[in-house]
Amino acid sequence: MIDKKITFVFGSGRKDKIEAEKNYAKEFFYSYFDLKKKYVDTNLIEFNDNNRNRLLINIDRLLRKLSGLSFFTNSIIKGENYKILKNSDIVIATNDRIGLSVLPMIRLIKLKKQMKFCVIVMGLFSNRPKNKSRLKLQNSFLRTLLKTADEFIFLGKPELMEASDKYPAFKEKFTFIPFSIDETFWKDQVNDFSDREGILFIGNDSHRDYKFSIDLANKMPNVNFTFITSQIREIDLISENVSFIEGKWNNQTLSDENLREIYNNSKLVIVPLKNSLQPSGQSVTLQSMAMGTPVLITMTDGFWDIENYKNNENIFFLNENTLNEWVEKIESIYYDSNKLKKISESGKSTIMKEYKIENFTNNLEKLISK
């Protein structure tokens, strides 16, 4: 066992998932369980969205408004969490919102002791305000984070390149580690595409093109669609060919096992995206490919790892969200079981080679042991 103390800082929902003692996918724990087996002391703390520190709430709102950055210090700053962080040798903030929110505590701790502070990046450098005053303030906060953190783990290559270009003095801190999924959990059971049916849309982030997805389902009344999201109201889905499940990862309205079954029974997963440098749609794409369900996704500037994806070989790409183009593409592949089977097998092979959770763990271990 390695004699160091690691603390992972998560958004809400991880403790509930662990305590439920159900079978679930492990990728959104970012190798917490693997490192727990190797390090003497591995802790986790998480956001508590029920915290009601009025002062911090008001400060967060002001900082978000002025900088365009996601500060939620109210959800994480408290004495108990500070003590855990202070006793840690390595702290891993599992997204940039968390990194910004724990920043005041980390800076205070680093005045008194050495520790390694790592931040996983998912869009931190992709939201640049047009207002000069906001941009100046945002840069000030980003530079503070860049100086304080020891390592930045990018889940998308384009955002890493953008950050390296804008902040070259800190690029030695930047590392690309591909997001990887729990391939032991996401395993398909239905191999015959004649037994699969329907198109699945799933996701909640701000870069999904929800309106386009609804319009697409309305445009194809002869194909069944399933929407799993908390960002669309059921009343907006007026077509009879659409099923709706309100779902979000951290509220457990839909278990991972339920979701796996839906993937397994779907013929195609669609991921229409708005253009951004953020690697949006990543987890859904990888989960779907691991399940052998082909993915049709919008090619964006932030697509995370283009070298490992080939259009019409292990994935389907479209460059724009235009209804006629998407309808034409879906109609050309949806009824072609041989084509779907080929993409399915190639997609699963890509996951097993490049995006197993073991790969993420190995890369993370190398980084934190530097």
For every predicted segment, state its role.
Residues M1-N50, K86-D89, D215-P221:
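N-terminal subdomain of nucleotide-sugar transferases
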Residues E27, D192-L259:
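Conserved catalytic-core segment of nucleotide-activated headgroup transferases in glycan assembly
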Residues F33, G79-N87, K132-F152:
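Membrane-proximal helix-turn-helix segments that form the acceptor-binding/catalytic region
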Residues K116, F125-T144, E183-F185:
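Nucleotide-sugar donor phosphate/pyrophosphate-binding loop at the beta->alpha transition
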Residues M161-D165, T175-R196, K211, L237, ...:
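Acidic anion/phosphate-binding donor-loop and adjacent secondary structure
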Residues N204, Y309-L323, S332-S337:
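Conserved acidic donor-binding segment of nucleotide-sugar-dependent glycosyltransferases
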Residues E261-S280, T293:
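Acidic donor-binding loop of glycosyltransferase active sites
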Residues S332, K339-E354, F360, K366:
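A short, well-ordered alpha-helix in the C-terminal region of glycosyltransferases
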